[in-house]
Amino acid sequence: MIPLSIRVPASTANVGPGFDSVGIALSLYLHVVVKEKSDKWQVIHSFEDSIPTDDKNLIVSTACKVCPSLSPHIIEVTSNIPLTRGLGSSASAIVAGIELANQLGKLNLTIDQKVQIATNFEGHPDNVAASILGGTVIGALDGKNVSVVRIESKELGVISLIPNEELNTDESRSVLPDVFPFHEAVKASAISNVLVAALCQKKWKVVGEMMERDHFHEPYRLELVPLLPSIRKCAKEFGAYGTALSGAGPSIFILTPYEKRQEIAEQLARVFTSMKVCELEIDHRGITVNKKEHIGL
Protein backbone atom coordinates (compact mmCIF):
# COMPACT_ATOMS: atom_id res chain seq x y z
CA MET A 1 0.00 0.00 0.00
CA ILE A 2 1.03 3.61 -0.45
CA PRO A 3 2.43 4.87 2.87
CA LEU A 4 -0.17 7.00 4.61
CA SER A 5 0.60 9.74 7.12
CA ILE A 6 -1.88 11.88 9.03
CA ARG A 7 -0.88 15.05 10.87
CA VAL A 8 -3.25 16.76 13.32
CA PRO A 9 -2.49 20.05 15.10
CA ALA A 10 -3.02 20.72 18.78
CA SER A 11 -5.59 23.28 19.82
CA THR A 12 -6.55 25.66 22.56
CA ALA A 13 -10.18 26.17 23.47
CA ASN A 14 -12.37 28.88 24.98
CA VAL A 15 -9.93 31.83 24.58
CA GLY A 16 -11.49 33.13 27.78
CA PRO A 17 -15.25 33.67 27.42
CA GLY A 18 -15.78 31.58 24.25
CA PHE A 19 -16.58 28.56 26.39
CA ASP A 20 -16.94 25.30 24.41
CA SER A 21 -17.17 27.44 21.25
CA VAL A 22 -13.94 29.25 20.27
CA GLY A 23 -10.87 27.24 19.34
CA ILE A 24 -7.46 27.96 17.82
CA ALA A 25 -5.18 25.41 16.12
CA LEU A 26 -1.58 25.41 17.36
CA SER A 27 1.79 24.34 15.99
CA LEU A 28 2.16 21.16 18.05
CA TYR A 29 1.29 17.95 16.22
CA LEU A 30 0.07 14.39 16.48
CA HIS A 31 1.41 12.18 13.66
CA VAL A 32 -0.04 8.83 12.63
CA VAL A 33 1.78 6.61 10.13
CA VAL A 34 -0.23 3.70 8.78
CA LYS A 35 1.85 0.61 8.14
CA GLU A 36 0.92 -2.86 6.94
CA LYS A 37 -2.28 -4.80 7.55
CA SER A 38 -2.30 -7.12 10.53
CA ASP A 39 -4.51 -9.72 12.16
CA LYS A 40 -5.20 -7.21 14.93
CA TRP A 41 -4.70 -3.51 15.58
CA GLN A 42 -1.27 -2.59 16.90
CA VAL A 43 -0.32 0.93 17.97
CA ILE A 44 3.40 1.64 18.23
CA HIS A 45 4.14 4.58 20.50
CA SER A 46 6.56 5.78 23.16
CA PHE A 47 3.99 7.37 25.48
CA GLU A 48 3.30 6.30 29.03
CA ASP A 49 2.20 2.71 29.64
CA SER A 50 -1.41 3.74 30.31
CA ILE A 51 -1.93 4.62 26.63
CA PRO A 52 -3.32 1.48 24.94
CA THR A 53 -1.44 -0.21 22.11
CA ASP A 54 -4.42 -2.17 20.76
CA ASP A 55 -7.96 -1.47 19.56
CA LYS A 56 -8.70 0.33 22.84
CA ASN A 57 -6.42 3.18 21.78
CA LEU A 58 -8.54 6.31 21.26
CA ILE A 59 -7.37 6.76 17.66
CA VAL A 60 -8.23 3.18 16.72
CA SER A 61 -11.47 2.96 18.71
CA THR A 62 -12.68 6.18 17.08
CA ALA A 63 -11.79 4.88 13.61
CA CYS A 64 -13.62 1.61 14.22
CA LYS A 65 -16.74 3.42 15.44
CA VAL A 66 -16.76 5.54 12.29
CA CYS A 67 -16.14 2.52 10.02
CA PRO A 68 -16.66 -0.83 11.80
CA SER A 69 -15.56 -2.82 8.75
CA LEU A 70 -11.98 -1.49 8.79
CA SER A 71 -9.22 -4.06 8.42
CA PRO A 72 -6.74 -3.95 11.31
CA HIS A 73 -3.40 -2.30 10.63
CA ILE A 74 -0.21 -1.52 12.45
CA ILE A 75 0.05 2.22 13.07
CA GLU A 76 2.86 4.30 14.52
CA VAL A 77 1.92 7.34 16.60
CA THR A 78 4.16 10.20 17.70
CA SER A 79 3.17 13.51 19.24
CA ASN A 80 4.63 16.57 20.90
CA ILE A 81 1.21 17.61 22.24
CA PRO A 82 1.36 17.32 26.05
CA LEU A 83 -1.28 14.99 27.48
CA THR A 84 -3.95 16.29 29.89
CA ARG A 85 -2.62 19.84 29.77
CA GLY A 86 -5.51 21.63 28.03
CA LEU A 87 -3.97 21.57 24.55
CA GLY A 88 -6.43 19.29 22.80
CA SER A 89 -4.54 15.99 22.97
CA SER A 90 -7.71 13.88 23.10
CA ALA A 91 -9.37 15.99 20.40
CA SER A 92 -6.38 15.48 18.10
CA ALA A 93 -6.60 11.72 18.66
CA ILE A 94 -10.31 11.74 17.81
CA VAL A 95 -9.69 13.77 14.65
CA ALA A 96 -6.87 11.41 13.66
CA GLY A 97 -9.15 8.42 14.18
CA ILE A 98 -11.85 9.89 11.97
CA GLU A 99 -9.33 10.56 9.22
CA LEU A 100 -7.88 7.07 9.62
CA ALA A 101 -11.36 5.64 9.00
CA ASN A 102 -11.92 8.07 6.14
CA GLN A 103 -8.72 7.03 4.37
CA LEU A 104 -8.71 3.28 5.00
CA GLY A 105 -12.47 2.95 4.56
CA LYS A 106 -12.55 5.22 1.49
CA LEU A 107 -15.48 7.12 3.03
CA ASN A 108 -14.86 10.42 1.18
CA LEU A 109 -16.09 12.42 4.16
CA THR A 110 -16.53 16.16 3.66
CA ILE A 111 -14.97 18.63 6.07
CA ASP A 112 -18.41 19.40 7.50
CA GLN A 113 -19.04 15.70 8.09
CA LYS A 114 -15.70 15.32 9.85
CA VAL A 115 -16.51 18.27 12.12
CA GLN A 116 -19.97 16.84 12.86
CA ILE A 117 -18.64 13.37 13.68
CA ALA A 118 -15.78 14.73 15.79
CA THR A 119 -18.13 17.00 17.73
CA ASN A 120 -20.44 14.07 18.43
CA PHE A 121 -17.50 12.21 19.97
CA GLU A 122 -16.00 15.17 21.85
CA GLY A 123 -19.24 16.85 22.97
CA HIS A 124 -18.23 20.36 21.83
CA PRO A 125 -16.78 21.69 18.56
CA ASP A 126 -14.01 24.07 19.66
CA ASN A 127 -10.94 21.79 19.82
CA VAL A 128 -11.90 19.31 17.11
CA ALA A 129 -13.01 21.95 14.60
CA ALA A 130 -9.77 23.87 15.10
CA SER A 131 -7.72 20.72 14.54
CA ILE A 132 -9.66 19.86 11.37
CA LEU A 133 -9.86 23.34 9.83
CA GLY A 134 -6.84 25.13 11.26
CA GLY A 135 -6.86 28.81 12.18
CA THR A 136 -9.43 30.21 14.59
CA VAL A 137 -12.89 28.67 14.72
CA ILE A 138 -16.16 29.67 16.34
CA GLY A 139 -18.59 26.80 16.70
CA ALA A 140 -21.99 26.02 18.16
CA LEU A 141 -23.59 22.69 19.01
CA ASP A 142 -27.38 22.92 19.11
CA GLY A 143 -28.70 19.51 19.91
CA LYS A 144 -27.14 17.40 17.17
CA ASN A 145 -26.48 20.24 14.72
CA VAL A 146 -23.01 21.78 14.53
CA SER A 147 -22.27 25.17 12.97
CA VAL A 148 -18.67 26.34 12.58
CA VAL A 149 -17.12 29.50 11.14
CA ARG A 150 -13.37 29.77 10.47
CA ILE A 151 -11.42 33.02 10.50
CA GLU A 152 -7.77 33.93 9.88
CA SER A 153 -5.58 35.36 12.62
CA LYS A 154 -2.14 35.43 10.99
CA GLU A 155 -1.04 38.58 12.81
CA LEU A 156 -1.06 36.83 16.18
CA GLY A 157 1.68 35.06 18.07
CA VAL A 158 0.99 32.41 20.68
CA ILE A 159 2.76 31.47 23.89
CA SER A 160 1.80 28.52 26.06
CA LEU A 161 2.95 28.04 29.65
CA ILE A 162 2.74 24.35 30.47
CA PRO A 163 3.07 23.12 34.08
CA ASN A 164 4.47 19.73 35.04
CA GLU A 165 1.22 18.78 36.74
CA GLU A 166 -1.58 17.12 34.82
CA LEU A 167 -5.20 18.23 35.16
CA ASN A 168 -7.91 15.86 34.04
CA THR A 169 -10.68 17.56 32.06
CA ASP A 170 -13.36 15.82 34.13
CA GLU A 171 -11.80 17.18 37.32
CA SER A 172 -11.62 20.68 35.87
CA ARG A 173 -15.26 20.52 34.75
CA SER A 174 -16.39 19.25 38.15
CA VAL A 175 -15.77 22.66 39.75
CA LEU A 176 -18.14 24.43 37.32
CA PRO A 177 -21.65 25.31 38.49
CA ASP A 178 -24.62 23.26 37.31
CA VAL A 179 -26.79 26.38 37.14
CA PHE A 180 -25.83 29.84 35.88
CA PRO A 181 -28.01 32.85 36.88
CA PHE A 182 -29.74 34.52 33.94
CA HIS A 183 -28.21 37.97 34.51
CA GLU A 184 -24.73 36.43 34.75
CA ALA A 185 -25.33 34.51 31.52
CA VAL A 186 -26.33 37.73 29.75
CA LYS A 187 -23.19 39.48 30.96
CA ALA A 188 -20.92 36.55 30.09
CA SER A 189 -22.37 36.01 26.62
CA ALA A 190 -22.08 39.72 25.81
CA ILE A 191 -18.36 39.58 26.58
CA SER A 192 -18.04 36.48 24.38
CA ASN A 193 -19.89 38.26 21.57
CA VAL A 194 -17.44 41.16 21.66
CA LEU A 195 -14.50 38.72 21.71
CA VAL A 196 -15.72 37.09 18.50
CA ALA A 197 -16.47 40.41 16.81
CA ALA A 198 -12.99 41.67 17.72
CA LEU A 199 -11.40 38.49 16.35
CA CYS A 200 -13.26 38.97 13.07
CA GLN A 201 -12.25 42.63 12.80
CA LYS A 202 -8.67 41.99 13.98
CA LYS A 203 -9.00 44.38 16.91
CA TRP A 204 -6.38 42.54 18.92
CA LYS A 205 -6.31 44.81 21.97
CA VAL A 206 -10.05 44.32 22.36
CA VAL A 207 -9.55 40.57 21.94
CA GLY A 208 -7.02 40.68 24.77
CA GLU A 209 -9.37 42.63 27.02
CA MET A 210 -12.32 40.32 26.42
CA MET A 211 -10.35 37.08 26.84
CA GLU A 212 -9.46 38.21 30.36
CA ARG A 213 -13.07 38.98 31.38
CA ASP A 214 -14.61 35.52 31.32
CA HIS A 215 -17.46 34.70 33.70
CA PHE A 216 -18.32 31.20 32.46
CA HIS A 217 -15.46 29.07 33.79
CA GLU A 218 -12.20 30.78 34.79
CA PRO A 219 -13.46 32.19 38.13
CA TYR A 220 -14.32 28.63 39.22
CA ARG A 221 -11.08 27.08 37.98
CA LEU A 222 -8.68 29.56 39.60
CA GLU A 223 -8.26 27.28 42.60
CA LEU A 224 -6.87 24.63 40.22
CA VAL A 225 -4.56 27.05 38.37
CA PRO A 226 -3.53 29.63 41.01
CA LEU A 227 -0.69 31.12 38.93
CA LEU A 228 -3.06 32.48 36.26
CA PRO A 229 -3.46 36.01 37.74
CA SER A 230 0.28 36.57 38.15
CA ILE A 231 1.05 35.20 34.68
CA ARG A 232 -1.66 37.44 33.24
CA LYS A 233 -0.21 40.50 34.96
CA CYS A 234 3.36 39.81 33.79
CA ALA A 235 2.32 38.97 30.24
CA LYS A 236 0.45 42.26 29.92
CA GLU A 237 3.46 44.18 31.27
CA PHE A 238 5.67 42.43 28.71
CA GLY A 239 3.41 43.48 25.82
CA ALA A 240 0.96 40.59 25.34
CA TYR A 241 -2.59 41.20 24.20
CA GLY A 242 -4.24 38.84 26.65
CA THR A 243 -3.98 35.66 28.73
CA ALA A 244 -6.46 32.87 29.45
CA LEU A 245 -6.65 29.27 30.53
CA SER A 246 -5.98 26.90 27.66
CA GLY A 247 -9.11 24.81 27.53
CA ALA A 248 -9.76 23.31 30.95
CA GLY A 249 -6.16 24.00 31.98
CA PRO A 250 -3.69 23.69 33.52
CA SER A 251 -1.76 25.24 30.60
CA ILE A 252 -1.96 29.00 30.12
CA PHE A 253 -2.58 30.50 26.68
CA ILE A 254 -1.25 33.95 25.72
CA LEU A 255 -1.91 35.96 22.54
CA THR A 256 0.81 38.39 21.47
CA PRO A 257 1.76 40.54 18.50
CA TYR A 258 3.41 38.07 16.11
CA GLU A 259 6.71 39.95 15.99
CA LYS A 260 6.98 40.13 19.81
CA ARG A 261 6.19 36.52 20.68
CA GLN A 262 9.82 35.41 21.11
CA GLU A 263 10.77 38.38 23.28
CA ILE A 264 7.72 37.96 25.51
CA ALA A 265 8.28 34.20 25.80
CA GLU A 266 11.88 34.74 26.91
CA GLN A 267 10.79 37.26 29.55
CA LEU A 268 8.11 34.92 30.90
CA ALA A 269 10.55 31.99 31.00
CA ARG A 270 12.84 33.98 33.28
CA VAL A 271 10.00 34.65 35.72
CA PHE A 272 8.03 31.39 35.71
CA THR A 273 10.87 28.90 35.91
CA SER A 274 8.69 26.01 37.11
CA MET A 275 6.71 25.97 33.85
CA LYS A 276 7.66 25.08 30.29
CA VAL A 277 7.27 28.20 28.15
CA CYS A 278 6.53 27.38 24.49
CA GLU A 279 6.63 29.94 21.72
CA LEU A 280 4.05 28.66 19.22
CA GLU A 281 2.27 29.74 16.07
CA ILE A 282 -1.31 29.40 14.94
CA ASP A 283 -1.59 26.45 12.57
CA HIS A 284 -3.53 27.54 9.48
CA ARG A 285 -3.65 24.21 7.63
CA GLY A 286 -5.52 21.96 10.01
CA ILE A 287 -5.36 18.23 9.48
CA THR A 288 -3.16 17.11 6.58
CA VAL A 289 -2.85 13.74 4.87
CA ASN A 290 0.20 12.60 2.94
CA LYS A 291 -0.02 9.41 0.92
CA LYS A 292 3.48 9.53 -0.56
CA GLU A 293 5.88 10.05 2.29
CA HIS A 294 5.95 9.99 6.06
CA ILE A 295 5.65 13.61 7.12
CA GLY A 296 7.18 14.95 10.30
CA LEU A 297 8.81 11.68 11.36
UniProtKB/Swiss-Prot annotation:
Coiled coil feature spans: none
GO BP terms in the entry: threonine biosynthetic process
Residues reported in the UniProt entry to bind ATP: P82, L83, T84, R85, G86, L87, G88, S89, S90, A91, S92
Pathway(s): Amino-acid biosynthesis; L-threonine biosynthesis; L-threonine from L-aspartate: step 4/5
Any one Gene Ontology cellular component term annotated for this protein: cytoplasm
Known catalytic reactions: L-homoserine + ATP = O-phospho-L-homoserine + ADP + H(+)
Gene3D superfamilies linked to this entry: 3.30.230.10, GHMP kinase, C-terminal domain (3.30.70.890)
Record Pfam families: GHMP_kinases_C, GHMP_kinases_N
UniProt KW keywords: Amino-acid biosynthesis, ATP-binding, Cytoplasm, Kinase, Nucleotide-binding, Threonine biosynthesis, Transferase
Localisation: Cytoplasm
GO molecular function: ATP binding; homoserine kinase activity
EC number: 2.7.1.39
Keyword ATP-binding: yes
Function per UniProt: Catalyzes the ATP-dependent phosphorylation of L-homoserine to L-homoserine phosphate.
Alphabetized PANTHER family for the sequence: HOMOSERINE KINASE (PTHR20861:SF1), HOMOSERINE/4-DIPHOSPHOCYTIDYL-2-C-METHYL-D-ERYTHRITOL KINASE (PTHR20861)
Similarity-based family: Belongs to the GHMP kinase family. Homoserine kinase subfamily.
Name of the protein in its database record: Homoserine kinase
